[in-house]
Amino acid sequence: MSSVTIERIETCLVDLPTIRPHKLSVATMYGQTLMLVKVYCTDGAVGIGEGTTIAGMAYGPESPEAMKLAIDAYFAPALVGKDATRIQTLMAHLGKLVKINHFAKSALETALLDAHGKRLGVAVSELLGGRRRERLPVAWTLASGDTSRDIAEAEQMIEVRRHNVFKLKIGAKELKTDIKHVAEIKRVVGEHAAVRVDVNMAWSETQAAWAIPALADAGCELVEQPVASAAALARLMRRFPVALMADEILQGPDNAFEIARVNGADVFAIKIEQSGGLFAAQRVAAIADAAGIELYGGTMLEGAFSTVASAHLFASFANLQWGTELFGPLLITEEILTKPLDYSDYQLTVPDGPGLGIELDEEKVRRFTRDGLIKVTKA
């Protein structure tokens, strides 16, 4: 056993405004809450992890508040005093102690990896096998709910060379209205940008079978999670000249294997939180590669810490055919890092410093911490 142990664990909720309302088929977001967790080790290393969700509990069973409670009440007491360098052993222990709670586990695993990378003087990507790329292509989601506003937003992104791939949130309106929305945006951006859509499970199989060919005719190249059922998604496969991507139904390696077994998607949206952490997401990607399923780096609209953790993982992938959507920090009005991330030329630069390679602006975070409360668990 290493002499380096976990000394204490702190959690807090940070409520941050967004640049505009973000409209999905399931809900509309007016801000984002980050659950931040800090792991303090006896050698002085401090790791930071983050948990977020999309629109509170509208997307899934966990919320930032639930993550914080799970860590404070169950995970932190089980980790304090344990060997901080045996990350996979610790995560296996937590997996036996508490079922599911993938988002909370991902936040803790990120913090442990951040601390270990700082301890060893290497980037998290090196702890995951080594990066294959320094920069990642990043798509932007158009989700204002208004066609003209989305077009203006897309044109601005193209002009400043920040994004040239756009994912449109649809599914909340009538099918013909949504398809007209997609077609109009693609008509304006033309060959300057690619257009994809995310339905967030809003359609029935019958609706999807009608809408997907129309989306293909409109110039859409990928449809994300059009239906809620894995079986329905599998039945839709290979019927249309558009790639179909699994997202919400991907809840870790077990789900990934079952979807791959029935050839249930063209593309997997890899998300560290939804998978249960970076190592679990790595296994999801390995299953996809073995099955010939292509990869896309997804987001839970995370802040900087989960975004960068995801970037370190995605940078290590052999295949990343559909790029990423790691734009979460750009949706938030407040910069919580001492040095902003580098988004330029349609890509994100993966930080190369020890650990995650980023530093929290403590004063900024204190201003937005809910009720000024920070929970500390120590021996």
Swiss-Prot record:
GO molecular function terms noted in the UniProt entry: chloromuconate cycloisomerase activity; manganese ion binding; muconate cycloisomerase activity
Disulfide bonds: none
NCBIfam families found in the cross-reference section: mucon_cyclo
Cofactor: Mn(2+)
Family statement: Belongs to the mandelate racemase/muconate lactonizing enzyme family.
Involved pathway(s): Aromatic compound metabolism; beta-ketoadipate pathway; 5-oxo-4,5-dihydro-2-furylacetate from catechol: step 2/3
UniProt catalytic activity: (S)-muconolactone = cis,cis-muconate + H(+)
Pfam assignment, any one: MR_MLE_C
Top class in the EC scheme: isomerase
CDD domains in alphabetical order: MLE
Keyword annotations from UniProtKB, A to Z: Aromatic hydrocarbons catabolism, Isomerase, Manganese, Metal-binding
Active site positions: 169
Name the record gives this protein: Muconate cycloisomerase 1-1
PROSITE patterns named in the record: MR_MLE_1, MR_MLE_2
This enzyme's EC code(s): 5.5.1.1
Role description: Catalyzes a syn cycloisomerization.
Binding site for Mn(2+): 198, 224, 247
Superkingdom assignment: Bacteria
Subunit structure: Homooctamer.
InterPro entries, per the entry: Chloromuconate_cycloisomerase (IPR013370), Enolase-like_C_sf (IPR036849), Enolase-like_N (IPR029017), Enolase_C-like (IPR029065), Mandel_Rmase/mucon_lact_enz_CS (IPR018110), Mandelate_racemase_C (IPR013342), Mandelate_racemase_N_dom (IPR013341)
GO biological process: amino acid catabolic process; beta-ketoadipate pathway
